[in-house]
Curated annotation (Swiss-Prot):
Subcellular location: Host nucleus
GO biological process: base-excision repair, AP site formation via deaminated base removal
Its biological purpose: Excises uracil residues from the DNA which can arise as a result of misincorporation of dUMP residues by DNA polymerase or due to deamination of cytosine. Excises uracil residues from the DNA which can arise as a result of misincorporation of dUMP residues by DNA polymerase or deamination of cytosines. Therefore may reduce deleterious uracil incorporation into the viral genome, particularly in terminally differentiated cells which lack DNA repair enzymes.
Principal location: host cell
Catalytically driven reaction(s): Hydrolyzes single-stranded DNA or mismatched double-stranded DNA and polynucleotides, releasing free uracil
Recorded GO CC terms: host cell nucleus
InterPro entries: UDG_fam1 (IPR002043), Ura-DNA_Glyclase_AS (IPR018085), Uracil-DNA_glycosylase-like (IPR005122), Uracil-DNA_glycosylase-like_sf (IPR036895)
The name this protein goes by in its record: Uracil-DNA glycosylase
Superkingdom to which the source organism belongs: Viruses
One Pfam family matching this protein: UDG
Length: 250
């Protein structure tokens, strides 16, 4: 209730003051490369300004992760023209380890249970993969793996707490633009939230791989055994004559 009252009191009608691309990069903390690539329509810009304002309000009332400077690290580590694989998750870890990359943690933090299951699948299917001690996935991002959550912030200890703030305006637009403007990408959709994004992707131009979320709490289906990394590299080899190096330093 406190957050709702703050939003009503502080989020003004932004329709009369549209942002330039440079202003969008500053206000949304997105890289200039991604701002140019996304070409956000005016309506989405207005909605996203409201979302950013709501998150700023939430930070005044409770602990929100990741830190403001980390929310969109994905946009700085993985430029749009370098993307080869898109892994779509749900929202950040709510324990303070979130890094701005879906499933990844800050350097030096141990892998959470969900990421441990991802590493189990990698160890099963990728030659030479050694399970690292840290959950940092920055190396993947720099190689062209876009690690994208559908929701970019979360309240401490409350998974899914920011689903209602409108971050999907941005995450959906990222996926749609990549589908429209790039060719032969691999989209890995992990979990029910990620599956809702499938309609944004043109299957005639891209490979879409769906699986349950890697959380060990998922008791209905197994993530380990989905062969996503094998299938992704086979597709990349066909279209780019190269594969993704999934190994991470220990």
């Amino acid at each position: 209730m406190a957050l709702k009252q703050w939003m009503l009191a502080n989020i003004a009608d932004n329709k009369g003051s549209l942002l330039t691309p440079d202003e969008q990069a500053r206000v949304f903390c997105l890289s200039a490369d991604w701002i140019r690539f996304l070409s956000l329509p005016d309506h989405d810009t207005v909605l996203l300004r409201d979302t950013v304002a709501a998150v700023e309000g939430a930070r005044q009332l409770e602990m929100v992760y990741p830190a403001p400077e980390h929310v969109h690290r994905w946009s700085y580590l993985c430029p749009p023209e370098q993307v080869r694989v898109v892994i779509v998750g749900q929202d950040p870890y709510c324990d303070g380890s979130a890094s701005g990359l879906a499933f990844g943690t800050l350097a030096g933090r141990p892998p959470p249970p969900s990421l441990n299951n991802v590493f189990r699948e990698l160890a099963r299917t990728v030659d030479g993969f050694q399970r690292p001690a840290s959950g940092c996935l920055d190396a993947w991002a720099r190689r062209g793996v876009l690690l994208l959550n559908t929701v970019f912030t979360v309240v401490h200890g409350q998974p899914g707490s920011h689903r209602h703030l409108g971050w999907q305006t941005l995450s959906n637009h990222v996926i749609r633009r990549l589908s429209e403007r790039r060719e032969h990408l691999v989209f890995m959709l992990w979990g029910a939230d990620a599956h809702t994004c499938e309609y944004l992707i043109d299957r005639r131009r891209h490979l879409v791989l769906k699986s349950c979320h890697p959380s060990p709490r998922n008791t209905t289906r197994a993530f380990v055994g989905n062969d996503h990394f094998i299938l992704a590299n086979a597709y990349l080899d066909t279209h780019y004559r190269e594969t993704m190096d999934w190994r991470l330093c220990g």
